[in-house]
């Protein structure tokens, strides 16, 4: 009796997924397709047996960002399964973000066999090359068909791919050719599930492997800073592994206690509010020129640089001895070009530094930095009170006021995802200590608006009840993300800032446009009612008109367990004027009330 090739395809697909599960992959996001049918059947079988968690999505781009959110929150490899053709192209935006943000992500894509390539066959494209430029690793099955793969090759393929996704976390692509027939009959499925094995395919026990990988960089010479001299710490978005974040925080506490250096942290840095030396409104310090009198200083930069233009301008000026430390990522992460990079991680660097620092000198080792941090804290407290009075005095909702008030209205245990463009920049400038009361997530790898809602949904699968702050265009760009609302494990409060399009472009330095309309070519407002759209997806929603309404809407949203939408309308032109006026008025007020530091 001849055994159908479909049974072989199903068997190998099942073995492949079992091997991934044994490695520790728990979450699989499945997109529809015929060529990927054997993988779909295998995933469904393992899901029914509670061996993996299966989530389905009709949109490959949305699916990839959902998986990205799962990986970002858990620190574990998540997997996306797609069919062939343009389906694979839709994975690129999430792959780009996973690469730059260092999140472990695995793409399993079904493909046509070699005989159908380069001959005009339908849906046969060079998909094996679509993601290579941003992936940590690419591998594939035998081009003639996955049914020809051996046990040893399968184990090697999965093992290497998992290691490359986990080592310096990032995206990995495995392309799998499937020869027809693709779909096993019920008898073939039952035979495989009951233990049938391809003759000669050694079915050994698959054992989980510990996360022990060899570092991809060579041991570097210890790059030193003088803890007894003037210095400052700049902490960018967290790019290490989730499980390493606590040791990073511990190392930061050690180094700050030793040096007394002030800390300027990005909202996505993972730094917590109880960190000594944390300066909450540092971005405004740069915008009003408070750092201009500091001519020479050591700068310890941890991770990518925050997106403050004023900070970057200051760092480019002479007199800054800069050391950049990354969490295992040896790629150049210095767009300024003024630093020396150490890639073995901050905890490692601090431990090595503590071994070589001389005995504590007789004088107070913090005396040099004491004056600086004392002055910064004085300014920080003044700005804190000043912003509260300016932003809350009339009860109107503005984007800066929203960034300042929202963190105070949310329980401290509630994580927040902050979308790109205006929201993340306003949190950087105006949220104050609120950004450090909880874990914040966002797109700071490629800073796009692709997949904003879907990533928020993925984060919620791991984090539970959480909040997404997004603009109207970013939300509209990914409305298919609402389709995940059927998943009972997702509980997302979406606060949408509706400013009539791409409000951030009002901040461009364009006096006027010779030909064309600024609104048409930059803002691009859309004639869409988001509340009606929410209703179409079966969501509960609220409209907010003032700051008092916001507090009531937040209380209402937390009384529910489902996904909800809160719409907040703002005026992007007026908010741009407000930001400029805040900077100008603050500079004037400080010059009248406080003495500047040297």
Swiss-Prot record:
Pathway: Quinol/quinone metabolism; 1,4-dihydroxy-2-naphthoate biosynthesis; 1,4-dihydroxy-2-naphthoate from chorismate: step 2/7; Cofactor biosynthesis; phylloquinone biosynthesis. GO terms for molecular function: 2-succinyl-5-enolpyruvyl-6-hydroxy-3-cyclohexene-1-carboxylic-acid synthase activity; magnesium ion binding; manganese ion binding; thiamine pyrophosphate binding. It catalyses: isochorismate + 2-oxoglutarate + H(+) = 5-enolpyruvoyl-6-hydroxy-2-succinyl-cyclohex-3-ene-1-carboxylate + CO2. It is an enzyme of class 2 (transferase). Pfam families: TPP_enzyme_C, TPP_enzyme_N. Binds 1 thiamine pyrophosphate per subunit. PANTHER family: 2-SUCCINYL-5-ENOLPYRUVYL-6-HYDROXY-3-CYCLOHEXENE-1-CARBOXYLATE SYNTHASE, PROTEIN PHYLLO, CHLOROPLASTIC. Catalyzes the thiamine diphosphate-dependent decarboxylation of 2-oxoglutarate and the subsequent addition of the resulting succinic semialdehyde-thiamine pyrophosphate anion to isochorismate to yield 2-succinyl-5-enolpyruvyl-6-hydroxy-3-cyclohexene-1-carboxylate (SEPHCHC). Homodimer. This is 2-succinyl-5-enolpyruvyl-6-hydroxy-3-cyclohexene-1-carboxylate synthase. It comes from Prochlorococcus marinus (strain NATL2A). The lineage of its organism: Bacteria, Bacillati, Cyanobacteriota, Cyanophyceae, Synechococcales.
């Amino acid at each position: 009796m001849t055994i159908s090739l479909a049974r072989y395809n199903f068997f190998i697909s099942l073995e492949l997924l079992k091997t991934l599960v044994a490695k520790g992959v728990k979450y699989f996001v499945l997109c529809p397709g015929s060529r990927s049918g054997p993988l779909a059947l295998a995933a469904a079988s393992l899901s029914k047996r509670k061996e993996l968690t299966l989530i389905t999505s009709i949109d490959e781009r949305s699916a990839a960002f959902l998986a990205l959110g799962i990986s970002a929150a858990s620190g574990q490899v998540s997997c996306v399964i797609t069919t062939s053709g343009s389906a694979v192209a839709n994975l690129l935006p999430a792959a780009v973000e996973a690469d730059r943000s260092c999140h472990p992500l695995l793409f399993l894509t079904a493909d046509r066999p070699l005989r159908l390539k380069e001959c005009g066959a339908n849906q046969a494209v060079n998909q094996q090359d679509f993601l290579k430029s941003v992936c940590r690793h690419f591998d594939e099955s035998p081009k003639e068909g996955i049914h020809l793969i051996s046990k040893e090759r399968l184990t090697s393929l999965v093992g290497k791919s998992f290691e490359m996704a986990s080592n310096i976390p990032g995206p990995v692509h495995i392309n799998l050719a499937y020869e027809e027939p693709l779909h096993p009959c019920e008898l073939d499925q039952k035979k495989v599930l009951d233990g049938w094995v391809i003759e000669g395919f050694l079915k050994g026990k698959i054992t989980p492997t510990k996360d022990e990988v060899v570092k991809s960089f060579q041991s570097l010479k210890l790059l030193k800073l003088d803890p007894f001299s003037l210095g400052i710490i700049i902490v960018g978005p967290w790019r290490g592994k989730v499980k390493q974040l606590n040791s990073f925080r511990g190392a930061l506490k050690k180094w700050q206690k030793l040096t007394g250096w002030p800390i300027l942290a990005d909202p996505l840095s993972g730094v917590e509010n109880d960190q000594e030396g944390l300066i909450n409104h540092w971005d405004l310090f740069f915008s009003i020129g408070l750092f201009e009198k500091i001519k020479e200083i050591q700068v310890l930069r941890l991770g990518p640089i925050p997106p403050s233009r004023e900070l970057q301008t200051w760092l480019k000026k002479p007199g800054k001895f800069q050391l950049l430390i990354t969490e295992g990522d040896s790629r150049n992460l210095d767009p300024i070009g003024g630093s020396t990079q150490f890639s073995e991680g901050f905890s490692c660097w601090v431990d090595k530094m503590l071994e070589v620092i001389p005995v504590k000198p007789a004088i107070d080792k913090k005396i040099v930095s004491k004056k600086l941090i004392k002055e910064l804290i004085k300014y920080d407290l003044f700005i804190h009170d000043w912003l509260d009075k300016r932003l809350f005095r009339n009860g109107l909702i503005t984007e800066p006021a929203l960034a300042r008030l929202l963190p105070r209205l949310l329980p401290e245990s509630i994580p927040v995802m902050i979308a790109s463009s205006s929201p993340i920049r306003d949190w950087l400038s105006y949220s104050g200590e609120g950004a450090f009361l909880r874990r914040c997530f966002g797109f700071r790898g490629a800073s796009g608006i692709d997949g904003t809602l879907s990533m928020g949904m993925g984060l919620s699968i791991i984090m539970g009840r959480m909040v997404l702050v997004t603009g109207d265009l970013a939300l509209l760009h990914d409305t298919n993300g609402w389709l995940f609302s059927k998943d009972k494990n997702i509980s997302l409060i979406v606060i949408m800032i509706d400013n009539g399009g791409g409000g951030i472009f009002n901040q461009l330095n364009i006096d006027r446009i010779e030909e064309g309309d600024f609104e048409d070519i930059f803002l691009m407002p859309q004639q869409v009612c988001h509340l009606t759209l929410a209703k179409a997806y079966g969501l509960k929603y609220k409209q907010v008109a003032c700051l008092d309404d916001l507090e009531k809407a937040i209380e209402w949203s937390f009384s529910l367990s489902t996904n909800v939408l809160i719409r907040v309308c703002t005026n992007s032109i007026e908010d741009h004027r407000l930001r400029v006026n805040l900077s100008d008025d603050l500079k004037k007020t400080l010059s009248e009330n406080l003495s500047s530091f040297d």
